[in-house]
Swiss-Prot record:
The keyword Isomerase does not apply. Keywords: Chaperone, Periplasm, Protein transport, Signal, Transport. GO terms for cellular component: outer membrane-bounded periplasmic space. It is found in: Periplasm. Participates in the translocation of lipoproteins from the inner membrane to the outer membrane. Only forms a complex with a lipoprotein if the residue after the N-terminal Cys is not an aspartate (The Asp acts as a targeting signal to indicate that the lipoprotein should stay in the inner membrane). The gene is lolA. SUPFAM superfamilies: Prokaryotic lipoproteins and lipoprotein localization factors. The lineage of its organism: Bacteria, Pseudomonadati, Pseudomonadota, Gammaproteobacteria, Pseudomonadales. Its main location: periplasm. GO terms for biological process: lipoprotein localization to outer membrane; lipoprotein transport. It comes from Pseudomonas fluorescens (strain SBW25). This is Outer-membrane lipoprotein carrier protein. Monomer.
Amino acid sequence: MRLIRMLLLPALALTAVSAHADPASVASLKNLLDKSQTLTARFSQMTLDAGGTQLQETAGEMAVQRPGLFYWHTEGKAEQTIVSDGQKVTLWDPDLEQATINKLDPRLNQTPALLLSGDVSKINDSFDITSKQTSNVIEFTLKPKSKDTLFDTLSLSFGNGVINNMRLVDSVGQRTDILFSGVKANQPVPASKFKFDIPKGADVIQE
C-alpha cells in the first residue's frame, strides 16, 4: 500500500529547488486536467522493482471531484479505502478495523492525487513538466521541484483527452503503473462517495 499512501496521503515537508518547465506542456496539461470536474473509473495497479519483477498487483474503483474530493477503494486481500472530503483524508483498513485521519495538504507535491481533483492553476510551481505526443495519445512527465521526494518522476497519459494511466518511479527504480478503464468525466457523483462513516468500535488514529 506504499503507492496508495504516496498518491493520496500527505508526504514529508519538501524543500523547493529551481527547475525548468516547457510552457506549452504546462498549458496543455492544465487544460486537460481542468476539463474534468469529476472522474470515475476502475483501476488496476502493478508495482515492479527496478529489475522488472512484479511486487504487487491490485485493482479497485476511484472517484474524484474538484476541489479536493477523492475516493479510492482497493479490493481483494489488500482491501483499503481512502476518502477525502476536501478537509481531511481518512484511510480505512478493514482487516485492522482501523481508521487513520490526516489533514488534507492542498499542495500538489504533497498529495499527488490532487492533480485529478485539486487546483492545478499553479502546477508548474510544484513540477517541471514536459510532454510527448503520438497520434491521439499525449504523455506528460512531471519531475518534482523538490528534494527528498517519495518519487522521482510521475507520468500521466491521456488518450482522446481522457486520462488512461499514471506511472510513478521512485529513487531506487521501483515503478508503479496505474491503468484506468471505464473512465467517465463530468458525470454526477453522489456526495456520500466523499464521506466516510467510521464503523462503531473501530480504532481511530489522528495524524
